[in-house]
């Protein structure tokens, strides 16, 4: 089985960026997704250019910061996106507003000269029932996978699964290995969501999920994790292992 450890939130803060790069250089992270238009975006670009083997996708924002398009349908009444807890209650998203914002974020990424690996979203916003069909269309437009568990269909030989078990109280080396071993007989490729970081004051001020990111970083850079993955016949990979199927993920 192949395992994609994808680090979310690249570009959120410099501490997050530094943690992701450590997890890449010293650990098992070969894939990350970048938040466009956030404070540490340029820092992330500099690090990306220094680490060409790190595959990077877009971590679409619909619950953090301001829309690049400024479209009022996407905000909570001010300049910022709707809050996370309000996103799931909202049922009046305008399809064109969502589409234009997603395209704006992807185009901003491409303008930086970075190859686009795949698409996912902050707080899993793309799984909102009104956003999902639009974001799936955007992924198909750019011919990249979209994070989710519906990647492979009847005519696809590769089975894929996304897991968010490595989060919060689920962060441990023993826990992630036990979970992966339980999936090995069912899937060819498993994506593990992760959030490594060197916690900085900026992160503490904007995120309710901060301190455990350092524990994630410890696990992801542990030599024991690499050893156990190898012992159980698991290899680390990135989204390029899925692109060759010419299928697009959905949830």
Swiss-Prot record:
One Gene Ontology term from the biological process aspect of the record: polysaccharide catabolic process
GO MF, any single term: hydrolase activity, acting on carbon-nitrogen (but not peptide) bonds, in linear amides
Keywords: Carbohydrate metabolism, Hydrolase, Magnesium, Metal-binding
PANTHER family membership: CARBOHYDRATE DEACETYLASE, YDJC DEACETYLASE FAMILY MEMBER
Family per similarity comment: Belongs to the YdjC deacetylase family.
NCBIfam families for this protein: PRK02134.1
Protein name: Carbohydrate deacetylase
Highest taxon of source: Bacteria
Protein EC: 3.5.1.-
């Amino acid at each position: 089985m192949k395992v994609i450890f994808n680090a979310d939130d690249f570009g959120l803060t410099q501490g997050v960026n530094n943690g992701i790069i450590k997890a890449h250089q010293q650990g098992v992270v070969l894939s990350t997704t970048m938040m466009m238009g956030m404070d540490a975006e340029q820092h992330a670009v500099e690090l990306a250019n220094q680490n060409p083997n790190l595959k990077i996708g877009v971590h679409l924002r619909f619950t953090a910061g301001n829309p690049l398009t400024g479209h009022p349908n996407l905000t909570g009444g001010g300049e910022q996106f709707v809050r996370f807890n309000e996103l799931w209650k909202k049922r009046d998203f305008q399809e064109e507003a969502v589409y234009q914002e997603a395209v704006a974020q992807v185009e901003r990424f491409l303008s930086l000269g970075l190859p686009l690996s795949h698409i996912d979203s902050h707080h899993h916003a793309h799984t909102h029932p009104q956003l999902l069909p639009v974001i799936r269309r955007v992924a198909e437009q750019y011919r990249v996978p979209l994070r989710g568990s519906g990647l492979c269909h009847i005519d696809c030989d590769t089975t894929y699964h996304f897991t968010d078990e490595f989060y919060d109280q689920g962060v441990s080396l023993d826990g992630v290995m036990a979970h992966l071993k339980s999936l090995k007989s069912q899937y060819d490729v498993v994506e593990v969501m992760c959030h490594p970081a060197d916690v900085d004051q900026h992160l503490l001020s904007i995120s309710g999920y901060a301190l455990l990111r350092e524990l994630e970083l410890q696990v992801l850079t542990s030599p024991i994790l690499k050893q156990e993955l190898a012992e159980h016949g698991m290899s680390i990979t990135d989204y390029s292992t899925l692109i060759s199927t010419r299928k697009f993920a959905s949830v």
